[in-house]
Amino acid sequence: AGVVLKVDGSPVNASVMYQPGGAVNSTYIKRGLTPFGEYMPLRNLAEVVSPYAKSVVDFKAGSELVTHQVAGAALGPIICYEIINDRLVSEMSASSKALIVQTNSATFSGTAESRQQLAITRIRAKEYARSILSVSTIGISAFIDSNGEVVDEIGENVQGYLTGDLLLSDHATNASKWGTLIKIVILSLFALFGLRSFRKDRAV
């Protein structure tokens, strides 16, 4: 379940796994907070620019990677826009055999945001070879296989539920093993070709 809790007097965005009797089995606190939504960067300046900045409550970020254990398998919780954070997704994928992405898209109802976030989630499934259960308060919710294909989904603002299999995997892809290095090499090549083109243009 996705809940807002209080830790040391500050709100935290959390993924909580409950036992059938209601006791808490495990709690993951969101580590990658969303600027302007969960905290206000440069608050003093922002409040001068816009009085609305004062209404944004600063959440507290978690510091621990926690997985939910289900039938002996580790499922990795990812909360909302953590899905775009390479480091957080990589760490969670390496520590789990499937992922659960939880999000509240109510603010963006009727826009392309839900479909965009689902597309990003599908890329992550393929990138790390992990099946993903994507759960949204208003949709789109979906089962996504490890190839990034949507197995089943519920559309936005549609009442219903999904049942399905979340296949487990501990396969390490090249992206998970060499992701950072690959990005550095690609960026370096782009920079090299860009520099060569710049020199050619100046030579002409």
Q: Predicted regions span which residues?
A:
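Soluble catalytic domains of enzymes that build or remodel membrane lipids, polysaccharides, and related
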Residues: 1-178
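Selective detector of the "anchor" transmembrane alpha-helix that sits immediately C-terminal
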Residues: 177-200
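Cytoplasmic C-terminal tails of single-pass
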Residues: 203-204
